[in-house]
Amino acid sequence: DNIGVFDRSAPLPTGGHLEQADGTAWMALFSQNMLELAVELAAHDPTYEHMVFKFVEHFYYIAAAMNRPGQDGMWDEEDGFYYDLLQLPDGSATRLKVRSMVGLLPLCATTVIEKWQRQRVPRAMAHLAERMRRMPELWKTMHPTGPGHFGVADRGLMALVNPERLRRILTKMLDENEFF
């Protein structure tokens, strides 16, 4: 999948490397899908519970990388959109500010967590709560989850994008003058 505006698999003439917003979002979604499988396995065999921890951790690390604040993050606070990030050899970074599907794909990394799924892995849920307590800065940038944030039928939402960012991205996505 090479949906960028140039061939992202070729070496960069400037050196450095490209941090891809779409590829990173796909990996977050992959972690969510694997988490769902791990919950199913752990419900029948507790030896798989460590896999639940593993994929929760993977999702959090990916979310932290995508939502890193400042000039070296994929999220552009001023534009309200995700962009690929060019990391140059001198340590500086530049966002490639092209509105494309690249910036919309973080919306796909969203998983509904049912109450019964949480009940199947209580130790994993306790681990999640502890991780949330230790990473408060992350919860400002992704969708809040956990007690006090459950929705209809006590469902939770695990998403890269928090509600404010979701509204900002949708404003761009639904503006017929933004995407041609």
In which residue ranges do the predicted regions lie?
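Acidic, mature catalytic/reactive cores of soluble proteins
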Residues: D1-F180
